[in-house]
């Protein structure tokens, strides 16, 4: 099959994992600019949030190197994205919610014949299966 590591969903999941693991500092309750900027620039984030582009520009313009989660939660999707996860179970559930949000982008009528959409839908499905297995085995 098509390598999952070469799909947009993989890069998005990696950016989300980086955001939650190395990009969030529990001691200060803040995210790092680098991790926030990377995920705000991702095409999926920009498709799922009308505020992503503007927020990324604002953080850059105002030199917000360590934004608080409350500064980043501009809509429902960004609220999910920028809610810190404190343990592995929460992280797995978080990834599943993000994958489900992304899957909405590929449910449009008339796109089922497009080979890239088929590949991306399959990559989302495989990512969901892998995350779901992690959640079940982590219980």
Where are these regions (language model features)?
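Polyanion-engaging groove/track-forming segments
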Residues: 1-139
